[in-house]
């Protein structure tokens, strides 16, 4: 594909993930029209972070990937944007998106090679969940974090993100509870 220095679906997706070029946002992707109908690439309504599962489905459905260094879009972040503020609904939606992403490879018949690459995409979303969750005070937010404990295996897929690498090391050395406490401390400092 044009602009991508490697060829082959797995190599292209791996390259884009490793370089941080394949992120959970729709605005930086040009998609062939036929993929919208053949792969049901519609956004879910009524949820926040709807780009996460949309980009996940695209990663699993596309047969090739390209890359353009040209800037053609200017992003404007709203004051109430999920990337600026986290509330209980946003946290629930993020959790639901991650859980959906975990089911997609099976549902879409992804190869083992693609799944191994794809998990790093999902691991980044899981890392975002862990870092953002402490912003939601109360037992509901803490309960969601505990429900996600069994998904911490995703942190092994950390080669594409320093954030996920750090979370993985803390989890391995100190455990999930300590990881969550450190994320809570980080959230307090960030405010």
Predicted features and spans:
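A structural signal for short, well-ordered beta-strand segments and their strand-loop junctions
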Residues: 67-68, 116
